[in-house]
Amino acid sequence: MIKTFSQWLNEELDARDFKDLERFADDHFEELGLDVVFTKHFKDQVNNPRNGAAVTYDELENLLLRTYNAAGHKITKLPDGGEAVLKQLATWLNVPVKVIDQPDQPERELVLKTIMRKRHFETPNQEILV
């Protein structure tokens, strides 16, 4: 069955999409010594209708690329357990992240904990504009 543009546009992201996004992110962040990980909660929230407009694959790919280009080195300076919120003002996307050292691995984990589309998101954590 061929999907209409509207069906394609409103389609939820699935496990394959997240696997592709993680591979895309890892290809970029690997040189910074970071392994990008999406939590189950993050994946659930991407498809949450409370975000208003659905968070699209392209938005996530753009967010990851902009994060790498604009803030990759800033993220590497976060301490073990350090938290921050990636904020993309153009799309109102907010992504709380945590950096975790892995003693048995050469890379640290950059854990994307959740995502929400909210204009005036407030946090006590460091905000990183991307």
List PLM regions with ranges.
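Ribonuclease/tRNase effector modules and their secretory precursors
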Residues: I2-V130
